[in-house]
A protein has these predicted regions:
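Short glycine/threonine-rich catalytic loop with a Thr-x-Gly-x-Asp
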Residues: 59-65, 81-87
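An active-site-proximal "capping" alpha-helix that borders the catalytic cofactor pocket
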Residues: 84-99
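Alpha-helical transmembrane segments of multipass membrane proteins
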Residues: 45-49, 72, 97
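Catalytic Zn2+-binding segment of zinc metalloproteases
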Residues: 72-81
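Residue-level signal for inorganic ion chemistry
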Residues: 67, 91, 156
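C-terminal charged capping/lid subdomain of soluble metabolic enzymes
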Residues: 17-20, 103-170
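Active-site His/Glu-centered metal-binding helix of metallohydrolases
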Residues: 65, 69-73
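Carboxylate- and glycine-rich phosphate/diphosphate-binding segment that chelates Mg2+/Mn2+
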Residues: 1-63
Length: 170
């Protein structure tokens, strides 16, 4: 815990961008735990997922929740965002896509927003990143299978969804 307290605020925020993801990967109300217990819970969740899928062929892909958009933002460059901040934006974006697809309801989107707000994380795609540019970046994502692929929340929890209609993303 003391090491975390030595980090500059923005670097700490980048780390909690990754922690926020684990709320939706089985971590529940992590924000109610002290920070050291949150980190330990995240490490345990990640270890359990990796042990169950050592070669990243299935369930392990859930660890990429929020990362499809995050990687697109990072690839586009020229934005003053760090990885954890981009992941937070990606989590909110993925929640909206899941809502549009009928996978989650407005209350679940609000839960995503609540978690991200708790950590004071950004949630909006940089304005200068156009829909056309995003679609191009999504189609080049290394995890893309049969068109646009996202890791999305849904009735069975977070899972990989392939072949998403680009119209849903605009």
């Amino acid at each position: 815990k003391r090491q975390l307290e030595t980090l500059p605020h923005r670097e700490f925020q980048c780390g909690v961008g990754e922690i926020a993801k684990y709320h939706f990967l089985g971590g529940g109300r992590l924000d109610e735990l002290p920070i050291d217990e949150r980190v330990a819970a995240c490490v345990q969740i990640k270890a359990d997922v990796v042990m169950a899928d050592e070669r990243e062929g299935g369930r392990r892909a859930i660890l990429n929740y929020g990362h499809t958009l995050a990687h697109a933002i990072e690839t586009a460059g020229a934005y003053d965002l760090r990885h954890g901040e981009a992941v937070a934006i990606g989590i909110r974006y993925a929640a909206e896509i899941a809502r549009r697809l009928g996978r989650i309801d407005d209350d679940r989107v609000a839960e995503h927003e609540r978690v991200l707000a708790t950590y004071e994380l950004p949630t909006t795609v940089p304005e200068q990143l156009t829909d056309t540019e995003l679609m191009d970046l999504f189609s080049r994502d290394k995890k893309a299978i049969d068109g646009v692929t996202f890791v999305l929340d849904g009735p069975n929890g977070v899972e990989t969804v392939v072949g998403i209609d680009p119209e849903v993303l605009a």
